[in-house]
């Protein structure tokens, strides 16, 4: 396969990879999602990641139907990569893509859930040992020896189940013996150009020292000529002899070896000195290569039967690093395995992975699901089943956009074979996820670009999930309601699923039978005058923005008399009694204003 056949690789990139890696090695790096190899070859890490995502998951990338969906996808992988135990594991996590292969999704879920449970089973000391082992592995550059030592450390911790079962088949004694031999090489003994480390063989060390000395002299041949040239030298033969003696003394090489490297037909003294040094460098380079090959062969013989264990350790440690990294991520966020279904999206007590502060979990669903009948789910938290579309309404700062983002995150995580942030979830298979955040701009260009981004994916063949936020933000309210009605009807007609956020529920025409309206309600103010919201949507009910709570807070916090008077005027407009009820502990009268001013 040609390098330019891969997405994102043009002539210049192909030329770079060919020069640095060779075509065969470059193709291998792309097919194995080896970000490190591409970065070492000169590609920016972000670009290498994008190339590998397309190369290894082209079909799945089509699930990311909008820029906002792609942003959530990127944020999820960045979040997960933050728990990676090695740099290579982080790279492999970053190139995960949604999959349309149900068996592949189930297989990865099995591995990650097993890794999550394995990580949870470790005490703090064992976790520190695991992290320390992988840190040492990374610092050593992921060598074969580092992999062997990491495998031994993981076996001592006692990781079992799933991917870790491969560790149980390794021979500790054989690995320890192999580790000693592997300590004498840089890289892998399986490489054709293996480099034997200094200290592994005395003869090889001596040859390398002599080669280094000869190369240094060759770089300063003119200085050598000036050193050996002496007024007492009577002829050219004397200069040749002086050159051989000087080079032999400076390099530690036998004079006969230096003489053998000297030319027989030098044109002059300068030519003789430079040619002698070049020839000696060539001779010593060949000697170093021969000796290094001999030592490497001896080291391979020392490993002997343990070679298979070494190969397995290298492979297993890399896989375990990825699985356990994802397991750490799943454990940290208390992620659970979703049930994969054909159609529908339902979550019980779901949480946004992007919100740091503890928040109220919510239950929600569109499509057909079975969570409504589960034990432990209250009626208020039992989403109706069978509706194709929900229109979500309610309070400002009520978490509507966060709910859309959470549903998007749950669906994307499940599509990548990763557990999700909920107590329970059922996730269908979607060919496209259309997540569209609210945009503040109000002009025809934004409306047109928005419609271009959400309508084409909706009318394509296959299953589509629509998660669209506040259409009224991009056009006048009356027309926005008409557009939203059209989108809801189109979603139902196309057999898609959708959640649409709006403040225009009362302006909508009657919805299709398989669409419903849900609402989020503000319930008052806290003692600190913060808005108190019940983030759990109430199904089949239009939510309330309750502006009196916002006005109440503004009245209570106003310190300027005239500004406060303005807010009081608004309070009368929205209902003074309602505002006063929310400020039962506040007495906002002109006398209070004068006291505050004093």
What is each residue range found by the language model?
Residues 251-322:
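Extended, charged coiled-coil "arm/hinge" scaffolds of SMC/Rad50-like chromosome-maintenance ATPases
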Residues 346-598:
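ATPase nucleotide-binding head domains, primarily ABC-like/P-loop NTPase cores
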Residues 1-227:
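Conserved amphipathic alpha-helical "coupling/scaffold" segments
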Residues 175-193, 226-282:
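Extended, EK/Q-rich alpha-helical coiled-coil segments that serve as long dimerization/scaffolding arms
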Residues 236, 247, 313-316, 543:
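Hydrophobic (often cysteine-bearing) scaffold residues that line and stabilize catalytic clefts
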Residues 215, 219-236, 240, 285, ...:
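Coiled-coil heptad-register positions
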Residues 308-359:
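Charged, amphipathic alpha-helical linker segments immediately N-terminal to NTP-binding catalytic cores
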Residues 205-219, 282, 286, 311, ...:
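Generic structural signal for well-ordered, non-transmembrane alpha-helical segments
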């Amino acid at each position: 396969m040609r390098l330019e056949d891969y997405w994102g690789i043009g002539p210049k990139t192909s030329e770079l990879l060919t020069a640095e890696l060779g075509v065969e090695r470059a193709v291998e790096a792309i097919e194995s999602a080896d970000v490190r190899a591409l970065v070492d070859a000169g590609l920016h890490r972000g670009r290498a990641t994008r190339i590998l995502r397309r190369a290894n998951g082209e079909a799945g990338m089509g699930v990311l139907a909008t820029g906002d969906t792609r942003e959530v996808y990127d944020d999820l992988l960045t979040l997960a990569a933050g728990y990676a135990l090695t740099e290579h594991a982080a790279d492999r996590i970053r190139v995960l893509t949604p999959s349309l292969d149900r068996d592949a999704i189930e297989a990865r879920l099995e591995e990650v859930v097993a890794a999550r449970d394995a990580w949870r089973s470790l005490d703090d000391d064992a976790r520190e040992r695991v992290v320390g082992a992988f840190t040492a592995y990374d610092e050593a550059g992921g060598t074969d020896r580092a992999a062997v030592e990491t495998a031994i450390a993981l076996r001592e911790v006692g990781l079992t189940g799933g991917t870790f079962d491969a560790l149980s088949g390794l021979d500790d004694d054989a690995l320890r013996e192999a580790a000693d031999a592997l300590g004498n090489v840089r890289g892998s003994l399986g490489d054709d150009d293996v480099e034997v480390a200094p200290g592994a063989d005395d003869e090889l060390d001596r040859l390398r020292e002599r080669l280094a000395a000869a190369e240094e002299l060759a770089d300063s041949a003119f200085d050598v000529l000036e050193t050996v040239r002496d007024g007492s030298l009577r002829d050219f033969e004397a200069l040749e002899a002086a050159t051989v003696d000087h080079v032999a003394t400076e390099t530690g090489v036998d004079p006969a070896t230096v003489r053998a490297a000297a030319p027989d037909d030098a044109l002059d003294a300068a030519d003789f000195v430079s040619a002698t040094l070049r020839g000696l460098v060539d001779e010593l380079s060949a000697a170093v290569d021969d000796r290094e090959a001999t030592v490497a062969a001896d080291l391979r013989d020392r490993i002997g039967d343990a070679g298979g264990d070494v190969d397995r350790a290298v492979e297993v440690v890399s896989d375990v690093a990825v699985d356990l990294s994802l397991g750490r991520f799943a454990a940290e966020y208390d992620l659970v395995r979703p049930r994969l279904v054909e159609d529908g999206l339902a979550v019980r007590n779901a949480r946004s992975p992007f919100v740091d502060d503890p928040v109220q979990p919510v239950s929600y669903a569109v499509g057909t699901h079975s969570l409504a009948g589960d034990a432990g789910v209250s009626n208020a938290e039992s989403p109706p089943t069978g509706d194709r579309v929900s229109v979500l309404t309610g309070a400002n700062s009520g978490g509507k956009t966060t709910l859309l983002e959470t549903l998007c995150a749950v669906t994307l995580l499940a599509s990548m074979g990763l557990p999700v942030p909920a107590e329970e979830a059922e996730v269908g298979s979607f060919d496209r996820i259309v997540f569209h955040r609210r945009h503040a701009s109000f002009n025809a260009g934004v409306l047109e670009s928005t419609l271009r981004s959400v309508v084409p994916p909706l009318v394509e063949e296959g299953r589509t999930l629509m998660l669209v936020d506040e259409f009224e933000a991009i056009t006048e309210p009356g027309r926005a309601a008409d557009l939203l009605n059209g989108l809801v009807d189109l979603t139902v007609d196309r057999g898609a699923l959708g959640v649409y956020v709006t403040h225009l529920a009362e302006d909508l025409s009657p919805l299709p039978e398989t669409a419903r309206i849900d609402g989020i309600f503000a319930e008052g103010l806290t003692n600190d005058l913060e808005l108190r919201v019940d983030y759990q949507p109430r199904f089949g009910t239009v939510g309330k923005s309750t502006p009196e709570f916002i006005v109440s807070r503004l009245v209570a916090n106003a310190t300027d008399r005239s500004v406060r008077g303005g807010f009081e005027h608004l309070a009368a407009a929205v209902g003074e009694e309602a505002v006063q009820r929310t400020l039962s502990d506040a007495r906002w009268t002109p006398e209070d204003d004068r006291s505050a001013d004093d």
